[in-house]
Amino acid sequence: MQWYLVAALLTVLTSSQGILTTLSQSNGKYKYDYATIPFLAELFKLSFSSFFLWKECQSSSPPRMTKEWRSIRLYLVPSVIYLIHNNVQFATLTYVDPSTYQIMGNLKIVTTGILFRLVLKRKLSNLQWMAVVLLAVGTTTSQVKGCGDAPCDSLFSAPFQGYMLGILSACLSALAGVYTEYLMKKNNDSLYWQNVQLYTFGVIFNMGWLIYGDFKAGFERGPWWQRLFNGYSITTWMVVFNLGSTGLLVSWLMKYSDNIVKVYSTSMGMLLTMVLSVYLFNVRATLQLFLGIVICIISLQMYFMPVNMLVELPQALPVTSK
């Protein structure tokens, strides 16, 4: 499968995630425990990967699987990073409003590029660096409200701790992505075997988060497994399937492409969500959204277009004999 087909599908699924999540609400509230969504998505990814790993093991040429603990334990790290990131995310939102947090989240685009260079030793050209910065500018522009709106007034009025936590959140998100790419490419193990290790720890940590929530609430609603499917509808299951499928596509890109492609896919997905929201939820289209889309398209072209298509090479002069 070509990487650009996977990237396009990831863009569609990313844009669908926010829309499906909104549609799963009833009167602006969730009837289900939204903390169960990541757990079920991890369980779906683990089941999917386990099935196809089993299919590979039944073939005439068994897949390569590194089973030493010193290798397996490395797959624990992304789950730890995401656990820290989730806590930092909640802490950040106590200091800043959601709009400011979303705008600061675009810093992960640039930090991904920096870690891409430092950790994976992948060099970007000057033009590609400009494209990455433009992508961050474009996505930020699309999310900025009009200067007469409250979100615009509050953008620079948050406490200093809020901005520091927002930067830390962006760095942790980028670090998790870059580290996952390092894991996927460090050997020639089967993608499904790598996924099984990654998602096993994901299931364990998400289950631990649900148990922690029960203890924190004093088991007022009973243990998490008794209310696991409470309030679930067809739309809710679509959210689970969408989130799980998105994770599987991301792991494919980490293995066979890179983090920058993933960043472009998810960023374009966010822009597509905004455009679709104009038609589905009567959200007002803004000049900022239009300008952000234009900037991101220019960035996309700058990053992926071959150099010989960007510069018209001079034609060789005909040789004349004297």
Swiss-Prot record:
Main localization, broad class: Golgi
Lumenal face residues: 24-33, 97-100, 145-157, 220-233, 284-286
Protein name in the entry: CMP-sialic acid transporter 1
UniProt entry keywords in alphabetical sequence: Golgi apparatus, Membrane, Sugar transport, Transmembrane, Transmembrane helix, Transport
Subcellular location field: Golgi apparatus membrane
Organism of derivation: Oryza sativa subsp. indica
Family: Belongs to the nucleotide-sugar transporter family. CMP-Sialate:CMP antiporter (TC 2.A.7.12) subfamily.
GO cellular component: Golgi membrane
Lineage: superkingdom: Eukaryota
Protein function: Sugar transporter involved in the transport of CMP-sialic acid from the cytoplasm into the Golgi. May transport important nucleotide sugars such as CMP-Kdo (2-keto-3-deoxy-D-manno-octulosonic acid) in physiological conditions.
Side Cytoplasmic, residues: 1-2, 55-75, 121-126, 179-198, 255-262
Topology term for the membrane: Multi-pass membrane protein
This protein's encoding gene: CSTLP1
Transmembrane intervals: 3-23, 34-54, 76-96, 101-120, 127-144, 158-178, 199-219, 234-254, 263-283
Gene Ontology MF terms: pyrimidine nucleotide-sugar transmembrane transporter activity; sialic acid transmembrane transporter activity
